[in-house]
């Protein structure tokens, strides 16, 4: 198949003329075309010698239409009238005839001209009449100021924008004593506002509720599955050292006390370095901690980012690592029961029930003897009263059975069995008939209110079945 040749387009004549005029290598048709010396241009020049076209502008020049320009279709251009200076009218010169005198009178008769003020003519013989006064009192002018009255007026305008509103202070709830609470109704139309309380942590919760009303954002309670800690792209590295919980940065670099362990930690390593723990090699970032639950254990997790490779552009590439430390590795049992140690040894007396589990016996005896009220009376009274108060010492926390001001007899509950005591029954008869009902006060430090509520099914709203250290008034 023959090869098809394509002719390349030459540059324009103007571009060629700019480059080849100086060197003299222009083609034969470039210079006449640019300089206007073609055959057509020569014919127009020769024809213009014998034919006059006027100011029509016919030729090889720019098409401007001559001096008058092109006339638009549909009419002639509007004419412009030049307004020149206004000429003055000529002054008519009167010719002088032969009969006119050549002397012109310049001064007219002065008697005809009246100018200036008229002078009066005095014709009388008597002179002016002068009037005089015979009073010899000198003229005294009274220049004392007259009394002036000053009037000051004031006007009060009521502006609602600056009126202070009326403030009604309702009586607040006051505590009369340590056990009795009283409240009074509010004044006016104002009333107290009841705010529903929210239970943040309960036994029936799922574990995802916040443990306080304003939880700290540092450590999550239980991390959700959205973290992606156990994916195929994440390397799993267990950390057995418990220092990972409090000092995670000490595994990747040397100790630096100026950092917050609850936030993301960023490391700036030199080109060649050796970390304290080889598992933390090339770690540049340790993210915030998260508490997770895995197979019945509590686990502290931190996600780290390695920077093993570095490109020419400065980007660092590395794997994603999941560092975790098991805080409570409790093995699961088949029955799920955990054996508990008895709090009191066998053969303990009733006086041992008043002491703390972790109290030191030798130190407790020294504390009891230092209290004068306890050295002279037994620990347990004869009427089986229970009262306890905590006492803190420099060695340990000890619970010592001191008096709280009220000795309340212990009452039986649904799961408390006490020995029966023979208490004599005494009937009190009032000396006068009671016509007005009085309040009956039940004194108790710990008792159950409506024990039948215990066997009711649990609801979302928790019911308080008992009160402590209070009085109940019943009609």
Curated annotation (Swiss-Prot):
Protein name: Minor capsid protein L2
Organism: Human papillomavirus 62
Subunit field text: Interacts with major capsid protein L1. Interacts with E2; this interaction inhibits E2 transcriptional activity but not the DNA replication function E2. Interacts with host GADD45GIP1. Interacts with host HSPA8; this interaction is required for L2 nuclear translocation. Interacts with host importins KPNB2 and KPNB3. Forms a complex with importin alpha2-beta1 heterodimers via interaction with the importin alpha2 adapter. Interacts with host DYNLT1; this interaction is essential for virus intracellular transport during entry.
One Gene Ontology term from the biological process aspect of the record: viral penetration into host nucleus
PTM annotation: Highly phosphorylated.
Localization, UniProt: Virion; Host nucleus; Host early endosome; Host Golgi apparatus
Membership in a protein family: Belongs to the papillomaviridae L2 protein family.
Pfam families named in the record: Late_protein_L2
Keyword terms, alphabetized: Capsid protein, Cytoplasmic inwards viral transport, Disulfide bond, DNA-binding, Host endosome, Host Golgi apparatus, Host nucleus, Host-virus interaction, Late protein, Microtubular inwards viral transport, Phosphoprotein, Viral penetration into host nucleus, Virion, Virus entry into host cell
Entry's Gene Ontology molecular function annotations: DNA binding; structural molecule activity
Purpose of the protein: Minor protein of the capsid that localizes along the inner surface of the virion, within the central cavities beneath the L1 pentamers. Plays a role in capsid stabilization through interaction with the major capsid protein L1. Once the virion enters the host cell, L2 escorts the genomic DNA into the nucleus by promoting escape from the endosomal compartments and traffic through the host Golgi network.
Short sequence motif Nuclear localization signal: positions: 1-11, 455-463
Stored InterPro entries: Late_L2
TM spans (from-to): none
GO cellular component: host cell; host cell endosome; host cell Golgi apparatus; host cell nucleus; viral capsid
């Amino acid at each position: 198949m023959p090869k098809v040749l394509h002719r390349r387009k030459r540059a324009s004549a103007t571009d060629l003329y700019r480059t080849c005029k100086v060197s003299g290598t222009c083609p034969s048709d470039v210079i006449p075309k640019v300089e206007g010396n073609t055959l057509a241009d020569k014919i127009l020049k020769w024809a213009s010698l014998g034919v006059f076209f006027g100011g029509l502008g016919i030729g090889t020049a720019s098409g401007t239409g001559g001096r008058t320009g092109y006339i638009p279709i549909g009419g002639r251009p509007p004419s412009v009238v030049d307004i020149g200076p206004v000429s003055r009218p000529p002054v008519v010169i009167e010719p002088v005839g032969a009969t006119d005198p050549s002397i012109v009178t310049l001064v007219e008769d002065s008697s005809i001209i009246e100018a200036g003020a008229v002078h009066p003519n005095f014709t009388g013989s008597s002179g002016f009449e002068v009037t005089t006064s015979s009073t010899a009192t000198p003229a005294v002018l009274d220049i004392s100021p007259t009394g002036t009255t000053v009037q000051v007026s004031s006007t009060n305008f009521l502006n609602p924008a600056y009126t202070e509103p009326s403030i009604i202070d309702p009586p607040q709830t006051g505590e009369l004593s340590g056990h009795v609470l009283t409240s009074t109704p509010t004044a006016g139309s104002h009333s107290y506002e009841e705010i529903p309380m929210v239970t943040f942590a309960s036994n029936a919760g799922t574990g995802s509720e916040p443990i306080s009303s304003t939880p700290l954002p540092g450590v999550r309670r239980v991390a959700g599955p959205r973290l992606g800690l156990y994916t195929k792209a994440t390397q799993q590295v267990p950390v057995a050292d418990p220092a990972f919980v409090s000092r995670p940065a000490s595994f990747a670099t040397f100790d630096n006390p100026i950092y917050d362990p609850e936030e993301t930690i960023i490391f700036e390593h030199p080109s060649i370095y050796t970390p304290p723990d080889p598992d933390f090699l090339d770690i540049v970032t340790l993210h915030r901690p998260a508490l997770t639950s895995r197979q019945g254990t509590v686990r502290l997790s931190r996600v780290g980012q390695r920077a093993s490779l570095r490109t020419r552009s400065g980007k660092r590439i590395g794997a994603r690592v999941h560092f975790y430390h098991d805080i409570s590795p409790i093995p699961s049992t088949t029955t799920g029961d955990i054996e508990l140690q008895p709090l009191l040894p066998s053969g303990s007396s009733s006086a041992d029930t008043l002491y703390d589990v972790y109290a030191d016996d030798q130190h407790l005896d020294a504390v009891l003897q230092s209290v004068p009220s306890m050295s002279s009376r037994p620990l347990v009274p004869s009427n089986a009263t229970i009262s306890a108060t905590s006492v803190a010492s420099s060695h340990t926390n000890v619970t010592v059975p001191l008096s709280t001001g009220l000795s309340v007899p212990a009452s039986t509950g649904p799961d408390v069995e006490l020995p029966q005591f023979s208490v004599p029954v005494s009937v009190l008869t009032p000396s006068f008939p009671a016509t007005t009902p009085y309040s009956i006060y039940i004194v108790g430090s710990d008792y159950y209110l409506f024990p039948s509520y215990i066997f009711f099914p649990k609801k979302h709203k928790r019911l308080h079945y008992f009160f402590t250290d209070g009085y109940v008034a019943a009609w």
